[in-house]
Amino acid sequence: MSTLERIDPEIADVICEEEKRQRGKLELIASENFVSEAVREAQGSVLTNKYAEGYPGKRYYGGCEFVDMAERLAQERAKKLFDAEYANVQPHSGSQANMAIFFAVLQPGDTVLGMDLRQGGHLTHGSPVSFSGKLYNVVSYGVRKDTEQIDFDQVARLAREHRPKLIIAGASAYPRIIDFARFGQIAKEIAAYLMVDMAHIAGLVCSGLHPSPVPHADFVTSTTHKTLRGPRGGLILSHSNYTRLLDSQIFPGIQGGPLMHVIAAKAVAFREALQPSFKEYQQRVVADAAALAQELKALGYRLVSGGTDNHLMLVDLTPQGVTGRVAEETLDKAGITVNKNSIPFDQQKPQVTSGIRIGTPALATRGILPHHMKAVAGFMHRGLKSAGDEPALARLRAEVAEFCSAFPLFS
């Protein structure tokens, strides 16, 4: 019996059941992944006990000599990984990294140009329910109806018309390569700051499988999980002339003590991402996504923009007469985890949606390869066709669990 089982059997049971879920189901949520045992070990270490307000060498607490070493390693590895002059590894999340940029260069009421949430953007890019939409004047761009790819003519027109102080590039549900150089040109034309949120594609960027935003943006933010396959957390990259401005916005601006156990885990993840094997992993992620997209199209599914260039795709279920919410619930019963997602120009409410977003980072981590995507697409197709048929879904769930057992986790 473990210490946790003895002290708190209820939480121990929750963790046990969640591990079973992760082992036995196909994880197709594009923003989820499985960290290495080394990352988990660092995050569960004694570093969780240490307060360390401030930055290495400039702390407000004593006894920080070793956590200073951990944070410096994380900073240097992040800079090397993305060829950046500056890295702040303290943000607790991608949203807080974004908030720090807003607070650093904007005043309440300033104009921001960001991607519409319902066309692929993120809550923190100007949604009215987010701080970004509540404190600032937000103008939103989207995608073209014919290609379902970013409408750069619209971006340029809105930029010239509204003269935003900050332009945001990056997305949470966009399956194509983003032209950061073009965003940079538009921002320079109107003397705006450019912030790129690369949370979803950071792993692809550091592996050379997606163009880097670092040369074109004033600020780059990211999460450290998703394709980067680290602990849940945030990251800011920038140029050295912004060091004091950005450091002060994270602490004491919006955060107090950093999570040193998470920062150590970030350092481990960055070291893993610097290895040649990580690029090979990212190549599998992209190859898996391309193969899965092809198999789904062969089964009659319409993909937003016609396919994918990265790790994710959006499936429009309108032709199948199924909502995203029903698809998410049905596939979960079949042992397949996805999330409902709005598609461009969606007529359904955000709680319902016409589509699902799926991705392959977690599949590739398990060792599931492109030639397995025919089976994965087949499982999805059978699940969606079995909506409401509980016995059929139960049988399919058993098949999916058997399939997953060939690709063990946490070995």
Curated annotation (Swiss-Prot):
Source species of the chain: Syntrophobacter fumaroxidans (strain DSM 10017 / MPOB)
Key words, A-Z: Amino-acid biosynthesis, Cytoplasm, One-carbon metabolism, Pyridoxal phosphate, Transferase
Catalytic reaction list: (6R)-5,10-methylene-5,6,7,8-tetrahydrofolate + glycine + H2O = (6S)-5,6,7,8-tetrahydrofolate + L-serine
Residues reported in the UniProt entry to bind (6S)-5,6,7,8-tetrahydrofolate: L117, G121, H122, L123
Required cofactor(s): pyridoxal 5'-phosphate
Family in the record: Belongs to the SHMT family.
Function: Catalyzes the reversible interconversion of serine and glycine with tetrahydrofolate (THF) serving as the one-carbon carrier. This reaction serves as the major source of one-carbon groups required for the biosynthesis of purines, thymidylate, methionine, and other important biomolecules. Also exhibits THF-independent aldolase activity toward beta-hydroxyamino acids, producing glycine and aldehydes, via a retro-aldol mechanism.
Main localization of the protein described in the UniProt heading: cytoplasm
Positions marked as site (Plays an important role in substrate specificity): H225
Top-rank EC class of the record's enzyme: transferase
Keyword Cytoplasm carried by entry: yes
Gene Ontology CC annotation, any one: cytosol
GO biological process terms, semicolon-separated: glycine biosynthetic process from serine; tetrahydrofolate interconversion
InterPro entries given in the database record: PyrdxlP-dep_Trfase (IPR015424), PyrdxlP-dep_Trfase_major (IPR015421), PyrdxlP-dep_Trfase_small (IPR015422), Ser_HO-MeTrfase (IPR001085), Ser_HO-MeTrfase-like (IPR049943), Ser_HO-MeTrfase_PLP_BS (IPR019798), SHMT-like_dom (IPR039429)
Quaternary organization: Homodimer.
Record-linked PANTHER family: SERINE HYDROXYMETHYLTRANSFERASE, SERINE HYDROXYMETHYLTRANSFERASE 1
Keyword Amino-acid biosynthesis listed: yes
GO molecular function: glycine hydroxymethyltransferase activity; pyridoxal phosphate binding
Protein name (record): Serine hydroxymethyltransferase
Subcellular localization(s) per the UniProt record: Cytoplasm
N6-(pyridoxal phosphate)lysine PTM sites in chain numbering: K226
Annotated EC: 2.1.2.1
Pathway(s) per entry: One-carbon metabolism; tetrahydrofolate interconversion; Amino-acid biosynthesis; glycine biosynthesis; glycine from L-serine: step 1/1
Coiled-coil spans in chain: none
Database matches in Pfam families: SHMT
Superkingdom assignment: Bacteria
